[in-house]
Each structure stands twice: as C-alpha cells, then as structure tokens.
C-alpha cells in the first residue's frame, strides 16, 4: 500500500464536547425507572409510551410478544437473544441479556445492566443527532437482590439491512464502486462518533444497520449494540486501530486482501498515520489473530 495524504480533516473532540456527551449519558443512565418487589424478586423498567406502566406489566407484555407466532428470533447466543416482535402496537426489537453464573451476577451488583447502558447510550446518540433506532424501554430483573437478566427494547426500522450483507465477503456480487462508497461512508460514521466524544468498543459490520445502501444522498448507518458505547472520551490510536481491525475482520474469513485494504485506506483518509509501517503491522497481525479465532470456531 502507498502512503497518501489525508483527504479529510479530523480534529479530536473538544473537552466541552466530551463533557456534554458524558453528561447526557449519565443523565439517561439515571432514568427514574419504576421498581416493584415481590416474592424475593425485583423488577425495574420503563416504557416511553406509558411512563406509568408497572414493570410487571411490561415483563408480561414482553413475554407474550416473544412467544407469539409472528415473532422471529434474529440472533441467539448463550446469553443474548434478539427477537423481532410486536409490542403495544409497535414493531420492535427486543434484546435480552442473561447473566451467566454467580461471578457475573455479583459483578453487576456494582455496574449498570447492559440494557440500561444500551438505553443511556442510545438516548445520548439520538440527542446528539447520531442515527440509531429509537429506544423505547428497558427491563431489569433481580432475584433475592442479585441481578439475573435485563432486556432492551428499540423500534424496528423498516427498509434497513444488516451492513455486513453489503460490506462482507457475502457481498461479492456488489460492484466495486458501491463497496468503495459504503466503506467511505462507514469510516465517516465512525469518525462522527469520535468527533462527538463517543467510542464504540465493537464496530464489526453486523453491529450496524444500513439504510438506503444504493442512494448516496440518503444512505445512513444506524448504530446497534450500544451497551458497548463509551460516552465522553477522546479515542486514542489504540482504540482507532481496534475499530479498523473490527471492521476489517468482520468482512468474513473469505474476504480478499483488497477488500480489507479498502477499509484501511478509507480510515487512513482521516488518520494518515494508519499507513505507517508499525500501524499497518499492528492492523494485519491483529486481524490475522481475529480471523484465526473465527476459523477455529467454525
């Protein structure tokens, strides 16, 4: 690869910008959720359409929504289940987080739940004008005072697609100019986070929705998995390289070197130092380790 001059002017966020992002996040994190106690169990939650809804009623509605025939599981891992469903007349995405084992449960005695962190970050992004699905509510559940699970509810956004379908190796039929434009806009979307004093710790392409992918005037990336967002910070070089590796590594094990280099080049348009020999070595080594782990899991 050849080193080129930066095409864009990136300036780290000012301290006031970081303070604002941090303040918005902390305010949202302290959302006054209704809480009830019954039979050794505690429920806490909120639903924006009906602020006075009891958490027990919201839990009942969520359980009904995810078991209806028209619901569909989008993603399921050992501890996370993402379901598309209908709730209170809305089409929604319900993301449930289960805690695994006593150590993790004890840890969340001292940390906000993933759902509450998602809620706070999503509220912050929307107030800053950064695209993300509308946060609608969240639930937290404790058993005998110990955290057990939580769930986050966001609006379903019609007409969007998983960004990995357009940027990954499965997008092999996409014209090169489309891939280049998508990569350029993705780099810009991540830089927008940085400029707003926000760092996302997991920027793989499956953590973004893509809106109007073929229309350059309306094309938009929407951020998901916002429990991984850190608000009120200035991302440093290590964090930027990590994001580049996450994007490049998420293209899939069959992506070509040219496709990965395209991602690096679009980021380097904002951060020319990414083309330095040492930075490139870090990126390639880190990406290779990531891909090796994926192959072992297959």
Give the residues covered by each predicted segment:
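Catalytic-loop of the protein kinase fold
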Residues: 195-205
């Amino acid at each position: 690869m050849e080193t080129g001059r930066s095409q864009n002017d990136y300036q780290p966020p000012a301290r006031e910008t970081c303070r604002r992002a941090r303040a918005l996040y902390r305010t949202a994190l302290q959302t006054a959720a209704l809480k009830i106690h019954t039979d050794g169990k505690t429920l806490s939650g909120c639903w924006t359409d009906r602020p006075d809804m009891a958490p027990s009623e919201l839990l009942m509605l969520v359980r009904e929504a995810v078991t209806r025939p028209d619901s569909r599981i989008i993603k399921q891992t050992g501890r996370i289940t993402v379901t598309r469903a209908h709730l209170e007349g809305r089409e929604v995405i319900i993301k449930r987080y289960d805690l695994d084992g006593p150590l993790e449960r004890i840890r969340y005695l001292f940390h906000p739940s993933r759902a509450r962190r998602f809620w706070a970050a999503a509220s912050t992004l929307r107030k800053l004008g950064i695209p993300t699905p509308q946060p609608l509510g969240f639930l937290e559940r404790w058993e005998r005072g110990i955290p057990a699970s939580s769930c986050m509810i966001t609006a379903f956004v019609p007409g969007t697609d998983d960004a990995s379908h357009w940027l990954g190796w499965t997008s092999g039929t996409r014209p090169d100019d489309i891939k280049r434009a998508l990569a350029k806009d993705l780099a810009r979307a991540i830089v927008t986070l940085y400029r707003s004093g926000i760092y996302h710790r997991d920027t793989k392409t499956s953590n973004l929705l893509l809106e109007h992918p073929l229309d350059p005037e309306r094309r938009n990336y929407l951020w998901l998995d916002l429990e991984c967002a850190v608000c009120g910070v200035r991302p440093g070089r290590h964090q930027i390289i990590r994001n580049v590796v996450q994007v490049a590594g998420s293209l899939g094990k069959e992506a070509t070197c040219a496709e990965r280099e395209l991602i690096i080049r679009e980021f380097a348009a904002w951060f020319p130092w990414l083309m330095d020999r040492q930075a490139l070595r870090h990126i390639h080594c880190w990406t290779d380790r990531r891909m090796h782990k994926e192959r072992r899991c297959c």
